[in-house]
Curated annotation (Swiss-Prot):
Function: Component of the acetyl coenzyme A carboxylase (ACC) complex. Biotin carboxylase (BC) catalyzes the carboxylation of biotin on its carrier protein (BCCP) and then the CO(2) group is transferred by the transcarboxylase to acetyl-CoA to form malonyl-CoA.
Protein name: Acetyl-coenzyme A carboxylase carboxyl transferase subunit beta
Molecular function in Gene Ontology: acetyl-CoA carboxylase activity; ATP binding; carboxyl- or carbamoyltransferase activity; zinc ion binding
The organism's taxonomic lineage, starting at the top: Bacteria, Pseudomonadati, Pseudomonadota, Gammaproteobacteria, Moraxellales
InterPro entries: AcCoA_carboxyl_beta, Acetyl_CoA_COase_Trfase_b_su, ClpP/crotonase-like_dom_sf, COA_CT_N
Cellular component GO terms held in the UniProt record: acetate CoA-transferase complex
UniProt keywords, alphabetically: ATP-binding, Cytoplasm, Fatty acid biosynthesis, Fatty acid metabolism, Lipid biosynthesis, Lipid metabolism, Metal-binding, Nucleotide-binding, Transferase, Zinc, Zinc-finger
EC number(s) from the headed UniProt entry: 2.1.3.15
Gene: accD
Positions contributing to Zn(2+) binding: C59, C62, C78, C81
Cofactor(s) required, per the database record: Zn(2+)
Associated pathway: Lipid metabolism; malonyl-CoA biosynthesis; malonyl-CoA from acetyl-CoA: step 1/1
Matching PROSITE patterns: COA_CT_NTER
The CoA carboxyltransferase N-terminal domain, residue ranges: 55-317
Length: 317
């Protein structure tokens, strides 16, 4: 009798437990972790959906996927491997300047005097680059305030036909140098270019001489000219404005040279080992003055300009 009663009670308790589980929405074999808690599941789904739908970028070094919001917040430096990803010209300048007072050179537009055609006409290439970057040319020039310093600054946009230097790029750089000369303020240039623009032929090559002459006028007047070498800098830009600064800074692992590694190897018939043409290699051989992490770049530029211009360093006060 006692045994029958115990069996009945056990069965009753088991039935109650089953009913309770069904009431809580659990199925057979479902663990406590899988039990739905009101509100929590919906929040998790919303968060996961937001991450999946937010625009992301894959790091070209470690291949990690980074949301664009996180990338912008970290100055386009990979939070996983510290690789420096490209920045657009306008983002660089807005990032550098505390106050933008104006832009130079917007009146200059590219012409096609050679009627150059490779796989497509030059005007078509220009239109594609303008649509891609939302910029009219490969060089952007702004002037404004870096803390307590007035400066003129320019930056190449490598997305615009490889940051190539044509007549408009030359015009804008010369105008930037003339503005710095007239106002007696420093000029800072962020270089990122594949070199002279082949679609403009000799007109493009002439910009090397024009920009060099403009920099020489700054030197004679004692106006500081600082160059930041980003990845990559090659060709006619390296052979002119990018290597004529008073101070040369470089971002980590930036590729810097005149001809590319493959061209040099084919010419000298030797294999060139890494880190040939990297910023660190050039620092070791005295070509650049300092390799600076992007997070320290603004402070470094300001510190150098404050010293060169003999103005009080507000960071030191």
């Amino acid at each position: 009798m006692a045994n029958n009663m115990t069996d009945t009670m056990t069965k009753f308790d088991t039935n109650n437990d089953s009913a309770s589980l069904q009431q809580n929405g659990n199925k057979a074999g479902q663990s406590w972790f899988e039990r739905p808690i009101p509100g929590i599941k919906q929040q998790l789904i919303a968060q996961l959906t937001a991450v999946e739908t937010e625009p992301s970028t894959k790091c070209s070094s470690c291949h990690s996927v980074i949301t664009n919001t996180a990338l912008i917040f970290n100055c386009y430096v990979c939070p996983h491997c510290d690789h420096h990803l490209p920045m657009s010209a306008r983002e660089r300048l807005n990032w550098l300047l505390d106050q933008v007072e104006g832009e130079l050179g917007q009146e200059f537009t590219a012409k096609d005097p050679l009627k150059f055609v490779d796989s497509k006409p030059y005007p078509d290439r220009m239109a594609e680059a303008q649509d891609k970057t939302k910029e009219s040319e490969a060089l952007i020039v702004l002037y404004g305030k870096l803390r307590n310093l007035d400066i003129v600054t320019c930056a190449f946009d490598f997305r615009f036909m490889g940051g190539s230097m044509g007549s408009v790029v030359g015009d804008r750089f010369v105008q930037a140098a003339e503005k710095a000369l007239a106002d007696k303020v420093p000029l800072v240039c962020f270089a990122a270019s594949g070199g002279a623009r082949m679609q403009e032929g000799l007109l493009s090559l002439m910009q090397m001489a024009r920009t060099a002459a403009a920099i020489e006028r700054l030197r004679i007047a004692g106006i500081p000219y600082v160059v930041v070498l980003t990845n990559p800098v090659y060709g006619g830009v390296t052979a002119s404005l990018a290597m004529l600064g008073d101070i040369h800074l470089a971002e980590p692992k930036a590729m810097i040279g005149f001809a590319g590694k493959r061209v040099i190897e084919q010419t000298v018939r030797e294999t060139l080992e890494e880190p040939f043409q990297r910023a660190e290699f050039l620092l070791k051989h005295g070509v650049v003055d300092e390799v600076v992490h992007r997070h320290q770049m603004i402070d470094t530029i300001y510190r150098l300009l404050a010293k060169l211009c003999s103005v009080p360093n507000v960071d030191a006060q």
